[in-house]
A protein has these predicted regions:
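Aromatic-rich carbohydrate-binding modules that target alpha-glucans
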Residues: 194-224
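Structural beta-strand segments of beta-rich domains
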Residues: 189-193
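Short, solvent-exposed loop/turn and secondary-structure capping segments
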Residues: 15, 77-78, 132, 205-208
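Aromatic-rich peripheral "rim/lid" segments of glycoside hydrolase catalytic domains that contact
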Residues: 46-66, 70-162
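A general sequence property marking short-to-moderate contiguous segments
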Residues: 162-178
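Noncatalytic carbohydrate-binding groove/subsite architecture in carbohydrate-active enzymes
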Residues: 1-82
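Short beta-strand segments of immunoglobulin-like
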Residues: 180-185
Length: 224
């Protein structure tokens, strides 16, 4: 199979350029079978909405999409500002949760497009051998080649959760104080919170998990 492989392939502007170029080449008879999307991501970017949109658009012109060079580093640095740390160091539980959430959201989208996404290649096996170094914590295995929690989140996913339908019959919790609207719960046991954090990129809600996990709430492009 012949692939066109590129970086930043989820960026909306570059996505359109790649789409137009590959479409034009195929119309001229170039036998391109698929598109490769290099996956050097971080805990905040790209947005999974952009990844989803790119997969949707590319799938209209090719039958195969590969995610190549996948890693999700624990920072936002890019290009010449990227910190290539080779020394092991501590990483906060918050950053771990953000990375786990980004990996989980990514693979949920990849499963959504499973008819066209037929390969995912990680850019090395463990943090020890990563091109960005162990302190960037980018891969499913740690510096001692032990699987991290994110490995299980990728491998042992719940298929039912991918297409869960949440009922909108939310009511204030019976444990709320008089006049308190949030948190709200529905008949399925889902909870809804109202969080005011105008300067935050994300908020982690952890209930009774003892710091071992949590739900990451991320702002959309409108800041909500």
């Amino acid at each position: 199979l012949l692939f066109y492989n590129d970086y930043n392939a989820a960026d909306p502007q570059k996505r359109d350029r790649i789409y137009n170029m590959v479409k034009s080449m195929k119309e001229e008879g170039v036998p391109i079978d698929g598109i490769g999307m290099q996956g050097h991501y971080n805990i905040y970017g790209p947005s999974m909405e952009d990844v989803d949109a790119a997969l949707t658009k590319y799938s209209t012109i090719v039958k195969h999409i590969h995610i190549t060079e996948l890693d999700i580093r624990a920072n936002e640095e890019m290009g010449g500002h990227l910190n290539f740390s080779r020394e092991a160091g501590d990483i906060s539980q918050t950053v771990k949760l953000l990375q786990e959430d980004q990996y989980t959201r990514l693979f949920k989208i990849l499963r959504k497009h499973k008819d066209v996404v037929d390969n995912v290649t990680f850019w090395n096996l463990s943090d020890r051998d990563s091109w960005v170094g162990v302190r960037n914590y980018p891969l499913p295995y740690d510096e001692n080649y032990k699987p991290k929690r994110v490995y299980s989140l990728i491998k042992d996913f719940d298929p039912a959760a991918d297409n869960a339908v949440v009922k909108e019959d939310f009511r204030p919790s019976v444990l709320n104080q008089p006049g308190q609207q949030y948190p709200m719960v529905n008949s399925q046991g889902y909870a809804r919170f109202r969080v005011v954090a105008p300067d935050a990129k994300s908020v982690i809600v952890s209930l009774g998990l003892g710091g071992r996990g949590g739900t990451v709430l991320r702002k959309d492009k409108e800041g909500v």
